């Protein structure tokens, strides 16, 4: 059986912490910012921790070596 390859799109979008959690960037900051409040824009900064069940699926299917 060949080795599983890491999906290159997932490699760019997700980061796995040392404890096995998956970090991702908040969506919704590409365009259309004029209609959002400053608080909404501020809350979209930085990274978030994915729910465990979703993060486990990301690791299993898209980042098998990560």
Curated annotation (Swiss-Prot):
Disulfide bonds: none annotated. One of its GO terms (molecular function) is structural constituent of ribosome. It comes from the Bacteria. One of its GO terms (biological process) is translation. GO terms for cellular component: cytosolic large ribosomal subunit. The keyword Ribonucleoprotein applies. The keyword Ribonucleoprotein applies. Belongs to the bacterial ribosomal protein bL35 family. This is Large ribosomal subunit protein bL35.
């Amino acid at each position: 059986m060949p080795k599983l390859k890491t999906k290159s799109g997932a490699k760019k979008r997700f980061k796995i912490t040392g404890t096995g959690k998956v970090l991702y960037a908040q969506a919704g900051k590409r365009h259309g910012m004029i209609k959002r409040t400053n608080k909404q824009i501020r809350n979209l900064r930085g990274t978030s921790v994915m729910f465990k069940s979703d993060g486990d699926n990301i690791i299993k299917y898209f980042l098998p070596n990560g």
